[in-house]
Regions:
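Residue-level detector of beta-strand face positions
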Residues: 58, 76, 125-127
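Ligand/cofactor pocket segment of small-molecule handling proteins
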Residues: 50-56, 70-73
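The feature marks short-to-medium sequence segments in extracytoplasmic or secretory-pathway proteins
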Residues: 65, 69-102
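Membrane engagement elements in two modes
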Residues: 1-53, 80-90, 103-110, 119-183
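Mature extracytoplasmic domains of secretory-pathway proteins
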Residues: 96-97, 110-114
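A mature extracytoplasmic/lumenal domain signature
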Residues: 63, 71-73, 109, 132
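Short consensus segments that form the blades of beta-propeller domains
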Residues: 66, 116-119
């Protein structure tokens, strides 16, 4: 698997999807909010208190108006090719983030597979982007509770959720096969 080409494809699809109009429940096109300006977002990452090996992400819209972020955070690992795959697997699209609202995602960097122990790589930084054409933010492993580095093998991330608890629940359901579609 060439993860680098997959990342480029994911980013290209995400940019295209953010330009797509949002549809209201009546089926009529709704006014599409603009993409969030990077200066209007506060992006955070921290280790989960409840689940080993899980990072909690949050992004807050600090502006006074609604705007769009990608509905899946793009999470990459230092010099490694590729990005964490979304669970559930869905096409990229925009997610409206209301003014002064925060959404959450959960990221598992190391799979539970038997191959993970031998195949895992260790990185000293995790990079997160909320809108494909933004620079995003890099979080050092030490600040993420991993002084020896973050171990990575088949990483996955949830879509943005309404609460940190919901994000971790979706991650658990999706990675154990007990999940339902959760957008």
């Amino acid at each position: 698997m060439r993860a680098c080409s997959r990342l480029v494809t994911v980013a290209a699809v995400a940019v295209t999807a953010l330009a797509a109009p949002v549809t209201a429940s009546s089926g009529a096109p709704a006014a599409t909010p603009p993409r969030c300006a990077e200066k209007d977002l506060t992006l955070r990452a921290e280790p989960s208190d409840d689940s080993d090996g899980v990072l909690k992400l949050s992004v807050r819209n600090d502006s006074a108006r609604a705007c769009l972020v990608d509905r899946v955070p793009t999470v990459t690992y230092a010099e490694l090719d590729g990005a964490a795959l979304p669970v559930p697997t869905v096409p990229h699209a925009g997610r409206t983030l209301a003014a002064h609202t925060t959404v959450y995602a959960a990221v598992r960097s190391l799979s539970d597979s038997e191959d993970a122990e031998d195949g895992a790589r260790t990185v000293l930084a995790v990079h997160v982007v909320t809108v494909p054409d933004h620079d995003g933010r890099t979080f050092q492993a030490l600040k993420l509770g991993a002084p020896a580095g973050v171990r990575v093998y088949e990483p996955v991330t949830t879509l943005w959720q309404s609460s940190a608890h919901r994000a971790e629940t979706v991650l658990e359901e999706q990675t154990t096969g007990r999940g339902m579609f959760a957008a």
